[in-house]
Amino acid sequence: MVRRDRLRRMREWWVQVGLLAVPLLAAYLHIPPPQLSPALHSWKSSGKFFTYKGLRIFYQDSVGVVGSPEIVVLLHGFPTSSYDWYKIWEGLTLSFHRVIALDFLGFGFSDKPRPHHYSIFEQASIVEALLRHLGLQSRRINLLSHDYGDTVAQELLYRFKQNRSGRLTIKSLCLSNGGIFPETHRPLLLQKLLKDGGMLSPILTRLMNFFVFSRGLTPVFGPYTRPSESELWDMWAGIRNNDGNLVIDSLLQYINQRKKFRRRWVGALASVSIPIHFIYGPLDPVNPYPEFLELYRKTLPRSTVSILDDHISHYPQLEDPMGFLNAYMGFINSF
């Protein structure tokens, strides 16, 4: 009898917990995205949108040095947006006639359709479409990329090498801290869970919040160059815009695509004759030193490399903007 009473009370307790949890979970899942900070709002207001196959793509396009023919197109990383470039934006406008960046599909202020098969191939086609939209498809383009954007740049380079219809004419390429070699790439635990979680992945994306995001992202920055809480909120606001947290698992399939198309994309880097440079934050846990750098130099012996200070990690353009900009302009002025 005593045991039966205890079981009944336990069942009642769990029912009460469940009844309490349901509205709390419902409220949690409907938390609105954070308001944009003044800086992020200004970034959005100064940008524009164009339409690609019915989808709105956000981009920035600044006119810089008058009389210069040089154009630079910036390709951002995962899971953030074109806002990653804001610390070096003004510096680039002092050297280039046009400075252009976009939010890839599924990122930042661009549309984030779901369900959708996100792919590096589609993102490369969106970059090409943007340049056509701007009337720059026949101009020689300098590409500057980071992380996820490095792989988009590799696909653009492959199309350039193959002389594909509609491809960009690439003048130079500068990569930075991207996992271009699957064998030296070390994705974060949360990334592994989301990309290969199967039925669990959609649940994890819905449960993701600022706390989980910030604790996951902060370790890929150096110990002295970690973002402030307000900077992390800007990143999170970009992800939450248009419910972007719900497509993260789909976007992460790029890691599997890197493995599947390694020969195509690494081969493109190794076989073209244009100037290629790599800016490297050596404390990067995602592309660790020295394994990554040794393989890079072995695979691409003609490429030049800039290694930033020892404490700079995965986001060099945010952690050391002046060092990053100086390294990039040194490369541009070398040919």
UniProtKB/Swiss-Prot annotation:
Task: Indicate yes or no for the key word Magnesium.
Answer: no
Sorted keywords for this record are: Endoplasmic reticulum, Hydrolase, Membrane, Transmembrane, Transmembrane helix
Q: Which GO terms describe its molecular function?
A: hydrolase activity
> What's the Enzyme Commission number for this chain?
3.-.-.-
How does the protein's chain sit in the membrane according to the entry?
Multi-pass membrane protein
Q: Could you say which tissues express the protein in this record?
A: No detectable transcripts during preimplantation development. Isoform 1 was not detected in either in vitro-matured oocytes (IVF) or parthenogenetically activated (PA) blastocyst. Isoform 2 was expressed in IVF and PA blastocysts.
Q: Name one Pfam family in it.
A: Abhydrolase_1
GO CC field: endoplasmic reticulum; endoplasmic reticulum membrane
Which residue numbers does the motif RVIALD cover?
Answer: 98-103
- Does the keyword Transmembrane belong to this entry? yes
Q: Which domain of life is it from?
A: Eukaryota
Segments forming domain AB hydrolase-1: 71-310
Span-the-membrane segments of this chain are: 13-33, 88-108, 266-286
Name the family the entry cites.
Answer: Belongs to the AB hydrolase superfamily.
Under what name is this protein listed? Mesoderm-specific transcript homolog protein
